[in-house]
C-alpha cells in the first residue's frame, strides 16, 4: 500500500509530499521530478539528532527500519551541482547589488535661473519616482547657479532620463552622471552618435524614422541655426557604437556616422598633445623656440629637412610663397618697406656657417646658424633665413628686420 512521505530541499523550507510505491519504496525518478538534479534523500535521526542517509539501490529508495513515518526528508544534490547553484545565487546577488549601486545623483546642466526645486521635481516626476532634487544656489546672493541634482528610485528611470535632452522652463537641459561618478578605467560608452553631412530638408521625424530600423531611438536633435549635422541617441549603446564609422544614405544623401564625443574629452586630448602641435615645448619641433644647431633661435626651422626653404612653426607650415604674400601686404601698409629692403646690404650670408652661432661677435659682424643667419650693427639689426640644402631648388629666401636707432623707425625686409 502506497503512502506519502514529506520531502524538502532545505529543512527550513515547506515540504512536498511524494507518493511511494506499493512495496513501500520510493523511486528516485519520483524525487527528481519535483527536485531536478536530486541524487538521494537524508533525514535527521530523532534520537541522535544526526543526519542519516536513505538507502538507494538501482534508482530505488528504501524506507528506514522504522518506516517512512512522519519525518521530513531532505534532498541530496551532487557536490558539483550544489556548487554551481551556490555560485549562481551569489552571482545573482552581486548583479542586484551592482544595479542598486548604479542608481546615484544625476547632475542637471543648463537650468534657467528661475527654475525652483519644486519645478524640477514636478518635471522629473513624469519619468518616475523622485527621491531627491536640489538646485545649487550662490551662498551670498541666493540665486541659482544654473545647475542642480536629481535622484530616482529605479535604475531604469535613471537610464531613460540620461538618454535624452530635457526642455525645462523653455530651455534645453542635459542630465548625466557627474564626472566624479564615472570610472576612469571603464568609461561609459555613449549612446549618442554624430550624423554629419545632413541637409536642411532633413527633419527630426525623418531621422528618427530612419534610425529606428537599427534600434529604439530615444532622442533626435538638429541644432538651430542649421549647421549640417545632427545628434541621434539610442536606447542601447551597442547599437550606437556599431553604427560609428558607417556611411548611410538618407533621402539620397550620404551621411557619415561617428561617435558624439563630449567636449571635455576633446579638450583633454588637446591638452595632452600640446598647444601648438604634437610635440612639447610650444613653438618648434623639439622644445623652446626652434632647434637649429649652433645656438640659433629660429622659430621651429627644422634643420636639414627644409628642402624647399619653408619654415615650420609647430603645426603651421609657412613656405616662401606665403612669406612673399606677407611681404606684399606689409609693403602696402608700411611706406618705408622698400627703402629698408634696399638697404639690406649688411645682411648676413644665408649659408652654411653652422658653427658660427656660438662664436664671439663684434659689432657689424654677420653670422649664421644652420638654416638661420644673422647680422648686427650699431644702428640696426637684420635677421635672415636661408637653407643649407637649397642648391638648385631656387626656393631659398632671405628676410630681415631692420631697426634704425637714429630715426626710430622699423620695418620688415624680404
From Swiss-Prot:
Task: Give the keywords, sorted.
Answer: Chromosome, DNA-binding, Isopeptide bond, Methylation, Mitochondrion, mRNA processing, mRNA splicing, Nucleus, Phosphoprotein, Repeat, Repressor, RNA-binding, Transcription, Transcription regulation, Ubl conjugation
Task: Using the UniProt annotation, give all residue ranges assigned to the region (Interaction with UBQLN2).
Answer: 216-414
An example of a Pfam family matching this protein is TDP-43_C
CDD domains (UniProt xref):
NTD_TDP-43 (cd19609), RRM1_TDP43 (cd12321), RRM2_TDP43 (cd12322)
Gly residues: compositionally biased ranges: 275-303
Q: What is the protein name for this chain?
A: TAR DNA-binding protein 43
- Give any single GO term for biological process: regulation of protein stability
Region (Disordered) location: 261-303, 341-373
Q: Where is the RRM domain?
A: 104-200, 191-262
Q: Which InterPro entries match?
A: Nucleotide-bd_a/b_plait_sf (IPR012677), RBD_domain_sf (IPR035979), RRM_dom (IPR000504), TDP-43_C (IPR049124), TDP-43_N (IPR041105)
Compositionally biased region (Low complexity) = 342-358
Q: Which PANTHER family match?
A: RNA-BINDING (RRM/RBD/RNP MOTIFS) FAMILY PROTEIN (PTHR48033), TAR DNA-BINDING PROTEIN 43 (PTHR48033:SF9)
Q: Subunit composition?
A: Monomer and component of the SFPQ-NONO complex, which is probably a heterotetramer of two 52 kDa (NONO) and two 100 kDa (SFPQ) subunits. NONO is a component of spliceosome and U5.4/6 snRNP complexes. Interacts with CPNE4 (via VWFA domain). Forms heterodimers with PSPC1; this involves formation of a coiled coil domain by helices from both proteins. Part of complex consisting of SFPQ, NONO and MATR3. Part of a complex consisting of SFPQ, NONO and NR5A1. Part of a complex consisting of SFPQ, NONO and TOP1. Interacts with SPI1. Interacts with RNF43. Interacts with PER1 and PER2.
What is the name of the gene encoding this protein?
A: TARDBP
Provide the positions where the record notes the PTM Omega-N-methylarginine.
293
Q: Which GO terms describe its cellular component?
A: chromatin; mitochondrion; nuclear speck; nucleolus
Q: What is known of its domains?
A: The RRM domains can bind to both DNA and RNA.
| Phosphoserine modification, residue list | 183, 292
Write out the PTM section of this UniProt entry. Answer: Hyperphosphorylated.
Position of the Glycyl lysine isopeptide (Lys-Gly) (interchain with G-Cter in SUMO2) cross-link: 79, 84, 95, 102, 181, 263
Location in the cell reads: Nucleus; Nucleus, Nucleolus; Nucleus speckle; Chromosome
Skewed-composition ranges (Basic and acidic residues): 261-274
Q: What does this protein do?
A: DNA- and RNA binding protein, involved in several nuclear processes. Binds the conventional octamer sequence in double-stranded DNA. Also binds single-stranded DNA and RNA at a site independent of the duplex site. Involved in pre-mRNA splicing, probably as a heterodimer with SFPQ. Interacts with U5 snRNA, probably by binding to a purine-rich sequence located on the 3' side of U5 snRNA stem 1b. Together with PSPC1, required for the formation of nuclear paraspeckles. The SFPQ-NONO heteromer associated with MATR3 may play a role in nuclear retention of defective RNAs.
What is a single molecular function from GO for this protein?
RNA binding
Amino acid at each position: 500500500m502506497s503512502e506519502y512521505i514529506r520531502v524538502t530541499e532545505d529543512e527550513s523550507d515547506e515540504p512536498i509530499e511524494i507518493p511511494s510505491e506499493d512495496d513501500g519504496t520510493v523511486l528516485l525518478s519520483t524525487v527528481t521530478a519535483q527536485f531536478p538534479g536530486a541524487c538521494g534523500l537524508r533525514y535527521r535521526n530523532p534520537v541522535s539528532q544526526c543526519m542519516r542517509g536513505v538507502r538507494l539501490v538501482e534508482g530505488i529508495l528504501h524506507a528506514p527500519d522504522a518506516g517512512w513515518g512522519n519525518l521530513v526528508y531532505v534532498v541530496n544534490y551532487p557536490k558539483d551541482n550544489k556548487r554551481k547553484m551556490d555560485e549562481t545565487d551569489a552571482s545573482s546577488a552581486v548583479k542586484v547589488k551592482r544595479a542598486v549601486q548604479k542608481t546615484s545623483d544625476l547632475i542637471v546642466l543648463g537650468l534657467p535661473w528661475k527654475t525652483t526645486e519644486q519645478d524640477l521635481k514636478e518635471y522629473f516626476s513624469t519619468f518616475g519616482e523622485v527621491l531627491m532634487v536640489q538646485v545649487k544656489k550662490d551662498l551670498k546672493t541666493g540665486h541659482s547657479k544654473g545647475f542642480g541634482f536629481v535622484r530616482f528610485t529605479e535604475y531604469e528611470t535613471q537610464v531613460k532620463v540620461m538618454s535624452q535632452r530635457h526642455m525645462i522652463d523653455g530651455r534645453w537641459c542635459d542630465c548625466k552622471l557627474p564626472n566624479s561618478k564615472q570610472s576612469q578605467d571603464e568609461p561609459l560608452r555613449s549612446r549618442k552618435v554624430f550624423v554629419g553631412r545632413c541637409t536642411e530638408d532633413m527633419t527630426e521625424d525623418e531621422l528618427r524614422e530612419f534610425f529606428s530600423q537599427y534600434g529604439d531611438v530615444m532622442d533626435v536633435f538638429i541644432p538651430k541655426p542649421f549647421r549640417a549635422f545632427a545628434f541621434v541617441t539610442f536606447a542601447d549603446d551597442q547599437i550606437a557604437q556599431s553604427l560609428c564609422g558607417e556611411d548611410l544614405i538618407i533621402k539620397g544623401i550620404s551621411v557619415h556616422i561617428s561617435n558624439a564625443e563630449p567636449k571635455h574629452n576633446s579638450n583633454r586630448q588637446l591638452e595632452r598633445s600640446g598647444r601648438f602641435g604634437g610635440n612639447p615645448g610650444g613653438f618648434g619641433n623639439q622644445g623652446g623656440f626652434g632647434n637649429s644647431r649652433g645656438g640659433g633661435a629660429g622659430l621651429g626651422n627644422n634643420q636639414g629637412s627644409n628642402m624647399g626653404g619653408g619654415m615650420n612653426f609647430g603645426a603651421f607650415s609657412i613656405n616662401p610663397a606665403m612669406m612673399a604674400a606677407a611681404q606684399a601686404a606689409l609693403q602696402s601698409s608700411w611706406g618705408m618697406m622698400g627703402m629698408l629692403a634696399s638697404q639690406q646690404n649688411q645682411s648676413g650670408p644665408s649659408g652654411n656657417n653652422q658653427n658660427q652661432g656660438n662664436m664671439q661677435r663684434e659689432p657689424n659682424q654677420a653670422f649664421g646658424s644652420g638654416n638661420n643667419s644673422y647680422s648686427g650693427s650699431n644702428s640696426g639689426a637684420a635677421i635672415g633665413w636661408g637653407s643649407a640644402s637649397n642648391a638648385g631648388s631656387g626656393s631659398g629666401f632671405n628676410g630681415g628686420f631692420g631697426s634704425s636707432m637714429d630715426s626710430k623707425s622699423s620695418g620688415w625686409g624680404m
